[in-house]
Amino acid sequence: MTKPQGTGGKKKNQLTLAQLAAYDDILTDALVDHAYYWTTIPKNRTSYHPSRGIKEEEITKIIQNHLIVDPDIATAEEKLLATDGLKRFCNTLKTPREQNDFKAHLRRYMSIYLPDCPFEVNATNRYTIVTYEASITARRFIQRNETIKYLAGIQVVITPEEELEMSLRKKDFSLIVSSRSKSTSLFMGPARFANHDCNANARLITRGQAGIEIIACRNIEVGEEITVTYSESYFGENNCDCLCATCESNLRNGWRPVDGEAAVQKSIEDEQPTESSTPYSFRRKRRYGSTALQASRTPSVTPDMRPRVLRKSQSQMMLGERTSTTDSAAQGAGADGQSRKRALEMGTPPFTPTKKQKTTQYPVVPIALSTAPSRGSSDNETSKSPLSFSTTNDNVTDATSQGSESPGPIILSPEPTPIKQAIGLLKQEEGVNEVAVQQVPEAFTPPPSQPTEEEPPMVRPAFERLAARDRMSIANLISGPSSPAPPVVFSVAEVTTHRPKPQTLQLQKTDQTATISTLQTVTAAVQKEAPVVKTESPIKPTVGQVEKITQVQTTTKSCTPSKPKAQAAALPQHHMPVSTAPRGRVPHDYTLTPLLLSEPETAWIMCTHCASAFVQKNAYLTKSTCPRCERHSKLYGYMWPKTEKYGPNDKEERILDHRMINRFLTAEEEARARGRVYWRERMGSKGKQGSSAPSTKGTPAGEKNEQSAKQEQSQGQYVQERFAVRKKVKVQVRSTVPTPVIMTKKDEVAEAAALGLRRSGRARRVSAKLADCELDF
C-alpha cells in the first residue's frame, strides 16, 4: 500500500506543462532578454507580456558583481529574487514546492554567466531570415565525450492534444521524442537553445527523472554552434524540410534546388581572407589618385567591412510572384493568350494612363444578363463588363498596350437587329493571319444613313484582350431561362482616336464628348436550345455603305508607339508562362540579403573582431563589433571569448563600465569602410603635389633631409623677420602718438571761455549790440 502511495505522490508533485512554461518565460525575459541581448527569446505562451519590474541596469549589475567578477550563486539568487519583477512572480507561487522548483530553474539560467561556462547564448536567422532565434555557440574548445557544463535543462512529458495545440500555435520548437519510449517531451532551460542538425556535434542525455544534459559527440571548436538531433522525422518525413547547416552544405532537404534551377556553388567568401588582401571598395570611380586604397576588383575575394547590398524595389521583388487578377478564371484554351499578355506586361513598362481600366484592378466576375437591356445603359455598367474597355481623348488607357499590335478594323452595326443564326467571332493571334472563330451572330445590319464626323475615330477589334479573357462563348452566356430572351449587347471592338482617318468607316455620333464607347451593339436571338455552328472561313458581314473587310491581320508598326531596342530585345516571341511554384531556399540567403534593409540607413556590417556579418540600424556611424561581441564586452569587460584573466601575467584591464569604450569606427576607419579617402591623407597628397618635388627627384635620402632642413630653417627665419617687422611698426606708431596733457577743471573752464564755448562745449551766442561795438572800435 505504501508503494502505490509513494508513486502516486511522486506523479502528483511533478511539474506540469503550464508551470514549466510560466517559469521559463519569465526567467528568459529577465536573465537573457534584459542582459544586453539584442533580440528576444521566443516565449512558450502567447499571452506573456514582459514585466515592468525587470530593469536591464539592475539585472546586469547583479550578474556582473555576483556571477562574473565574484561568483556567488547564493548571493546572486537572493539579489535577483529581491527585484520587483521576480519578487512579484515568486509571491504568486502558493506552495513551497513550486517556489523550490522556480529557484532551481533560476539557478540553471544563472549558471550560464559563470566564467567557466563553455558556451554563450547567440542568435541566428538561418531558419526564418527575417526573425532571429536563439542558438548556442562554444566560447572555448570542447573535447569529445565531454559533458558540456551548465548546458542542462528539465523536461516534461506532454500529451498528443497538448502537442497538437503547440504545433498550431507554432510553439513546438523545444519538443524531443524519446528513442526508447517514443514519447514526446518538452524540455526547458538553457538546453532548449540548442538547435537541430542532421549531423549534430552533441547529443541529449536524460539524467534522473526529468533532467537533461548534453554531451559532445566530437571536438567542438571555438565559435562553432552546438547542435543536437531532435528526431529522425521532426521536420517532416525523414526531415525533408530541415534547414540545418549540414543540409545547407549538402544542398538537400529544405535546401534542395527547385526544379529547373542550377545548384549554387559554394562561394569563396567563406574562405578566410589573407593578410595581404585589402578591403574591397564598391566605388566605381576613385575621387583621388591615392594608392592608399588599392583593393581587389573581385567582391567575392575580400568583402568590404561595409558591403553594399542593393535594395530591390517592391515592384521588382513582387514581379515574379504576382498573378493576373483579370485572368483569374481563365482555363484551358485561354492559357496561351494569358501567358502572352503577362509576357508583354512583365517585359516592358506600361504607358502612364490617364484613367486606369477597371478590368486591370478587379477580378472578372460573371455578370447576369439583364432581362430588359436598353440602348441608354450607362457607361459605368458597360465598363464593368469583362469584355469591355474604352479609350478617351486620344489617351491610351490600356496598361499593357505598349508594344502590342492592333488588328485591322471591323465595322459593326450600332443598332440592334434580329439575326437568323449564330456564327463565330474573329480572334486575331499576334503575327498570324489565321482566324479563330467563336459563337456570335452571323450577320450585321447596316446602320441608318447618318452624316459622318469630320474626323471619325478608328475602330479595331479587341482580339488581344479577348484572347486573354475566359473565352466564354455567347451560347454559354445567354443560356438561361426557357423563354426567349430579349437581345443582348456584347463588346467586340475597341475604339482609338489617335489613328489616321479611315476611308471605310461610318459611325453614328452618340455623344457630344470625344469619348466613344467600345461597345458596339450586336443582337442575338436567344433560344432555348440553339444549335452551335462553327466555321473556319472568314466572315463577310453585310454592312451597307461600308466596304467589306477583306482580311484580318495585325496593323503596321507605325500604329504602335516606338519602343527602345533594349525593351524590344527583352520581349521574346514565344510565350512566357508565370511560375507559381514557391521559391526555394538558397544557401547563405540569410546573410547580406536586402530583405533585412527595410528601414532607412540600415546596412550590413562585417565585425572587425569575429568577421561575421550583422545588420546595423541607423548606421550613420559604423559599429566596429557585432551584437554578440558587444554584449560579451559589456558583461565580462573583455573581448569575446575571454571571460577572466588567463593567469598572473595577464595585465589586461577589465572594463566593466561599457560607457568608457568607443563602439564605433574611428574617422579614418569610417572613411575607408565607405570607400573614401581620409582627409589627412587627402591633404597630405595635396601638400606633396604642391611642394618642390621635381627639384629633389633622384637625390639621395641624406641630401633630401638636408634640403628639407634648410627649407624649414628658411621658413623659420622668414617668420621671425615678419614678427620683427610687425614689432618695429608697433613701436614707431606708439612713439608718434603725443603724450596727453593733464588739465584741471579751472584750466578747462578758462580755455573754454577764451574759445567762446560754454561748459557743455557749445559755442556762445554773441549779441548784435556787442558785435556793432566791436566793429565801431
Curated annotation (Swiss-Prot):
Matching Pfam families: SET (PF00856)
Alphabetized UniProt keyword annotations: Chromatin regulator, Chromosome, Methyltransferase, Nucleus, S-adenosyl-L-methionine, Transferase
Composition skew (Low complexity), residue ranges: 323-337
Record carries keyword Cell membrane: no
A single GO molecular function term of this UniProt record: histone H4K20 trimethyltransferase activity
Region Disordered, residue ranges: 263-414, 682-718
Broadest EC class assigned to this enzyme: transferase
Domain SET residue range list: 117-231
Polar residues biased stretches: 291-301, 371-405, 688-698
Catalytic activity reported: L-lysyl(20)-[histone H4] + 3 S-adenosyl-L-methionine = N(6),N(6),N(6)-trimethyl-L-lysyl(20)-[histone H4] + 3 S-adenosyl-L-homocysteine + 3 H(+)
GO biological process: one example: methylation
Compartments it resides in: Nucleus; Chromosome
Family statement drawn from the similarity comment of this UniProt entry: Belongs to the class V-like SAM-binding methyltransferase superfamily. Histone-lysine methyltransferase family. Suvar4-20 subfamily.
Alphabetized PANTHER family for the sequence: HISTONE-LYSINE N-METHYLTRANSFERASE KMT5B, SUPPRESSOR OF VARIEGATION 4-20-RELATED
Name the record gives this protein: Histone-lysine N-methyltransferase set9
Organism: Neurospora crassa (strain ATCC 24698 / 74-OR23-1A / CBS 708.71 / DSM 1257 / FGSC 987)
